[in-house]
Amino acid sequence: MADSVHLNRRGVLFVLSSPSGAGKTTISRMMLEEDKDIALSVSATTRPPRPGEIDGVHYHFVDTDTFKKMAADGAFLEWAHVFGHRYGTPRAPVEELLAAGKDVLFDIDWQGAQQLYQEAGPDVVRVFVLPPTMEELERRLRARGTDSDEVIAARMARAANEISHWDGYDYVLINDHVGECYGEVMAILRAERLKRRRQIGLIGFARDLIRSVPDADTKL
């Protein structure tokens, strides 16, 4: 039996967006636990660390002046001002992962996804996760037991706004069963990894196959 063939490929910038409570965080965690070829993009932020958060693991914590300078220098693939704090995706570590054939997972909203697509185009795959109903979304938010009625109402209003941008994504999934939705997300990732334009070693491999046949009539 011949040895298996491994072709070099370019990584995927995999965006997973959803309203709060629709399952994005759970699915992201499952992806990172099960697939060692994908890494979570660590954002920079000006907000202070929360208890248990580690600099460089959960976020890169920077002051406002540092963040502004990074933005002015083009050091971010995307950034936004959200609830009084700035958040951004550092460019250099993402480009290093891509070049090494690693995939990068982004937990960002529709605005971040739009900016990222404008910057990185063909490398970006955008997936939006919808709840089965708004009633189910509210039930999930209340089941957390962490938010007041006022906060939940604000989250529901924000969710409606986020859902209105569903058509800016390449794939849209309905999460009525988290295991099935996770399977669909992974099917998308596997298919995107196999796209011809990402198989950077494919041209040379095909050329070698053809040249191994004497007198082959080929344009290669």
Swiss-Prot record:
Recorded catalytic activity of this chain's protein: GMP + ATP = GDP + ADP
Family under the similarity heading: Belongs to the guanylate kinase family.
Physiological role: Essential for recycling GMP and indirectly, cGMP.
Principal location: cytoplasm
Keyword tags: ATP-binding, Cytoplasm, Kinase, Nucleotide-binding, Transferase
GO cellular component: cytosol
GO molecular function: ATP binding; guanylate kinase activity
Highest classification ranks of the organism: Bacteria, Pseudomonadati, Pseudomonadota, Alphaproteobacteria, Sphingomonadales
SUPFAM superfamilies: P-loop containing nucleoside triphosphate hydrolases
Identification of the protein by name: Guanylate kinase
Subcellular localization(s) per the UniProt record: Cytoplasm
Enzyme class: transferase
Domain of life: Bacteria
Pfam families: Guanylate_kin
The protein's Enzyme Commission number: 2.7.4.8
Positions that bind ATP: 18-25
Occurrences of domain Guanylate kinase-like (ranges): 11-190
Keyword Aminoacyl-tRNA synthetase on entry: no
